[in-house]
Amino acid sequence: KAYMDYVDKRFRLLAESAPYFKKVKELGGRIDGNMSRVLSPGALDDSGAMCAAMIKAMTKGSKTDLMPLIDNYINYIMTKEHRLSDGTFARNRPFFNSVWLDDMFMGIPPVAWYAKVAGSNAQKYSDEAAK
């Protein structure tokens, strides 16, 4: 219970402050680099673990509306993260099409967990995580 309260309090802070900072960014203002990575992930490092943790918190009873953040993260993971032609997560640093175990750890679990909250699209995310 104490740990869940701790997690929920921090996720609530992100969920409640993200819309404000999103508006600031849209209006051309500068925002903190950490919040920028929440709003505009640029790597699995910015999105994977947070996405999976937020989904887990939701499935464990968090009352905070995390879906806008989760959807933003999963959109990055599914549509913007670099992949090989077969769909394997990869990166272009330090070398072109480098495959890292770390990317599997940060990419596959959030996709698999998203199947739990994806409603009628659950099979799509389960299949993606398994391939």
PLM ranges: what are they?
Residues 1-131:
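Glycan-recognition and catalytic cores of secretory/periplasmic carbohydrate-active enzymes
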